[in-house]
């Protein structure tokens, strides 16, 4: 992949839009079985991937509207979050071995009743940044009753935003069924945002060897 990993402290225009009811669920509960060690802790030249994902999420949603779902490495990751982050809420998914659906349920169950939508973010998409998520949130804020998702060759995928009317569907997922299942069912009602940077994720050591970094 030719895109370089870039850094920026710029905030999107929606960063302080805390009254619109958009919350973020960041999934960081997996075991990283294929990689062999926690991908959440994979370090680029500046910080672990999990902290980069949190930075991106906090650029578009207030810290107190961010839920980080931990699981396999709950005890190992909590100190890192305590040292580097504030304001967000940590949710422990004790059933992380049941698959990603269990983490989605844990996150949705922790949302307050006033949440109008949920932004779903992963920790293993290193090229997804604040500007990527800013495009999603801008589209959702124009159409808050619709799902908004990254465009993949095979249809919609994460990162994605689901409106409140679809949150019950997340609770019904099982095993390794993710948000894509719901987005596919929503069909043409899902708004797609071009996001080629989302296509790269870190699952194996080979993926790490392809990861490149920018200097800005």
Regions found by a protein language model. Give the residues of each.
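Conserved alpha/beta core of the MobA/IspD/sugar-nucleotide pyrophosphorylase nucleotidyltransferase superfamily
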Residues: 2-20, 168-216
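Nucleotide and nucleotide-moiety/phosphate-recognizing core
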Residues: 16-123, 127-156, 188-195
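Nucleotide phosphate-binding site architecture
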Residues: 32, 42, 167-168, 209
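Short aromatic/basic micro-patch
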Residues: 127, 161, 201-202
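Conserved hydrophobic/aromatic beta-strand scaffold that supports enzyme active sites
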Residues: 147-149, 159-161, 182
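A conserved catalytic-core signature of glycosyltransferases
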Residues: 156-157, 162, 178, 197
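Conserved nucleotide-sugar donor-binding
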Residues: 157-168, 205
């Amino acid at each position: 992949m030719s895109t370089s990993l870039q850094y920026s402290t710029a905030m999107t225009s929606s960063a302080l839009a805390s009254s619109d009811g958009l919350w973020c669920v960041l999934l960081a509960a997996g075991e990283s079985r294929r990689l062999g060690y926690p991908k959440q802790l994979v370090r680029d030249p500046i910080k672990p991937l999990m902290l980069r994902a949190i930075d991106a999420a906090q650029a578009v949603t207030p810290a107190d509207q961010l839920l980080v779902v931990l699981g396999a490495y709950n005890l190992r990751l909590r100190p890192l979050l305590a040292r580097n982050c504030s304001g967000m809420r940590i949710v422990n998914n004790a059933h992380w071995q049941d698959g990603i659906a269990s983490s989605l349920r844990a996150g949705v169950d922790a949302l307050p009743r006033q949440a109008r939508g949920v932004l779903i973010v992963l920790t293993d998409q290193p090229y997804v940044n604040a500007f990527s998520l800013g495009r999603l949130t801008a589209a959702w804020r124009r159409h808050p009753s619709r799902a908004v998702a990254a465009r993949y060759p095979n249809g919609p995928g994460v990162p994605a935003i689901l409106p409140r009317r679809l949150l019950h569907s997340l609770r019904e997922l099982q095993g390794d069924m993710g948000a894509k299942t719901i987005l596919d069912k929503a069909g043409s009602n899902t708004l797609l945002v071009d996001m080629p940077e989302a296509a790269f994720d870190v699952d194996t050591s080979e993926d790490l060897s392809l990861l490149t970094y920018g200097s800005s």
